[in-house]
């Protein structure tokens, strides 16, 4: 199950209690659904929970009934339609529209006077025309409608509620979207999906922890590579000295450091210092090993 479906399932568990909120949610559905005309209302969804909620929602809001829902075999999408003229008139009348005139869709803010109704409207819009990506991959939530005027007015409504949505045109549709995780969390909480918002927060924390671990691993790997490279340089220098002069030409302390390094080719400087007898400091041993790497060049 996709994250978007999980979000919609959670939204569909919000009770249909107040009549005004049911009307507002249905309004959001209609303005963001497949078809909303004076001849037909058609809602297409792949979400089972949303398909089950719609008949209850429209009965609560308008007393309207859908034609027997059809489930498409290809893709498993549900198609719910209303074609009865009287039912469509009832729906349009609820939003102050007159079917005898050409209908250009706009958001009637009179239907969304209270904050709970605005949240319900946005919930309906998301259920019908929204999607959100899996937060473990990236952050993106969008609302898609074929009505540019509706999208502009929805953007203004979101701004009033404290959300700054961006807008783009995608073919014949207009898209409002969020890409910041905090905005998506707040939006989902607003429309009734606080658990989904918490999932995004958890995913963000997990990402941050994984990034920290990766940075530490990369840093440790880089440090290990440096240790190996330095040790190899020292061993190469010691082998050259041994080949060209013999280690006996070295002062006792340098000879001791050379033999210690040859015997422990993968040891770090700190480990070598602890293995020295008598023990020496890291800086002291580092000085001796540096003298060894310079010995051949200076000779």
Identify the residue ranges that each predicted region occupies.
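Extended mid-to-C-terminal alpha-helical interaction segments
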Residues: 190-290
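N-terminal, positively charged regions that mediate nucleic acid binding
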Residues: 1-40, 44-58
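Short, solvent-exposed alpha-helical "recognition" segments
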Residues: 289-299
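Structural motif
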Residues: 15-23, 111-118, 248-252
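Short, hydrophobic/amphipathic alpha-helical patches that form generic packing surfaces
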Residues: 24-32, 120-128, 259
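DNA-contacting interfaces and partner/effector-binding or oligomerization modules
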Residues: 45, 52, 56-201
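Short acidic (Asp/Glu) and glycine-rich catalytic loops that position anionic groups and cofactors
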Residues: 34-37, 134, 167, 234-239
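Short acidic, hydrophobic short linear motifs in intrinsically disordered regions
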Residues: 36-42, 136-138, 268-270
């Amino acid at each position: 199950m996709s994250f978007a479906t999980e979000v919609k399932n959670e939204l569909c568990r919000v009770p249909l209690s107040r009549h005004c909120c049911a009307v507002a949610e249905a309004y959001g559905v209609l303005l963001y659904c497949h078809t909303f005309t004076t001849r037909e209302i058609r809602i297409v969804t792949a979400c089972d929970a949303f398909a089950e909620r719609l008949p209850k929602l429209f009965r609560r809001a308008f007393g309207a009934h859908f034609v027997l829902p059809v489930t498409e075999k290809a893709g498993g999408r549900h198609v719910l339609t209303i074609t009865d003229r009287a039912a469509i008139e009832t729906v349009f009348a609820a939003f102050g529209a007159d079917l005898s005139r050409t209908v250009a869709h706009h958001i009637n803010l009179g239907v969304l006077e209270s904050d709970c109704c605005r949240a319900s409207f946005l919930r309906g819009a998301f259920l019908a025309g929204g999607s959100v990506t899996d937060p473990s991959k990236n952050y993106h939530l969008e609302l898609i409608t074929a009505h540019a005027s509706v999208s502009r007015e929805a953007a203004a409504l979101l701004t009033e509620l404290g959300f700054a949505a961006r807008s783009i045109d995608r073919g014949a549709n207009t898209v409002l979207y969020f890409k910041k995780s905090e905005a998506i969390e707040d939006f989902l909480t607003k429309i009734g999906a606080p658990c989904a918002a918490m999932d995004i927060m958890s995913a963000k924390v997990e990402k941050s922890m994984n990034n920290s671990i990766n940075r530490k691993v990369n840093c440790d790997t880089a440090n290990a590579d440096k240790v190996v490279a330095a040790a190899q340089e020292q061993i190469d220098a010691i082998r050259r000295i041994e080949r060209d002069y013999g280690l006996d030409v070295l002062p006792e302390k340098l000879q001791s450091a050379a033999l210690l390094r040859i015997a422990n080719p993968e040891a770090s400087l700190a480990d070598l210092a602890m293995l020295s007898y008598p023990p020496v400091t890291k800086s002291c041993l580092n000085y001796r090993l540096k003298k060894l790497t310079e010995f051949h060049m200076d000779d």
